């Protein structure tokens, strides 16, 4: 009976340590949206690993937290924006979580309203301190580009 009680206790304790990674990522996305909508490029960059890679549509790779901050700063300065993110799936494998989702953004650029929406994939990496940060980010856009 004591062994059964010990086994039950161990199973219960191990279950209570399971992280709800999807909730953590959704919370991170809420911060991301908040930072973006108030124009805080440094805040957005802080949600990325130091060596993160961002792959925007029709652009080169943006590598490193500092460059990512510069990219978002330039985008934010381009026009007043309101971003929305919707996580559709999170799959965790060890120290990595793979998120797919949808985004929408409304911006006013030079007095003209621009609406964009698309899909994204983010790879999140668990840090030594327990935080989950964006390691890789790629998205597509509904906007048509002209050359």
Please report, for each region that a protein language model flagged, where it lies by residue.
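Short beta-strand edge/turn micro-motifs at domain boundaries
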Residues: 117-143
């Amino acid at each position: 009976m004591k062994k059964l009680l010990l086994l039950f206790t161990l199973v219960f304790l191990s279950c209570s340590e399971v992280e709800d990674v999807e909730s953590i990522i959704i919370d991170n996305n809420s911060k991301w949206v908040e930072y973006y909508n108030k124009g805080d490029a440094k805040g957005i960059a802080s949600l990325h690993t130091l060596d993160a890679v961002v792959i925007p549509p029709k652009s080169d790779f943006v590598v490193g937290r500092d460059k990512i901050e510069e990219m978002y700063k330039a985008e934010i300065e381009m026009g007043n924006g309101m971003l929305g993110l919707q996580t559709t799936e999170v799959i965790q494998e060890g120290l990595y979580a793979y998120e797919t989702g949808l985004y929408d953004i409304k911006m006013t650029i030079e007095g003209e309203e621009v609406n964009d929406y698309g899909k994204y994939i983010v790879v999140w990496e668990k840090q030594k301190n327990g935080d989950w940060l964006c390691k890789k980010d790629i998205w597509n856009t509904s906007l048509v580009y002209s050359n």
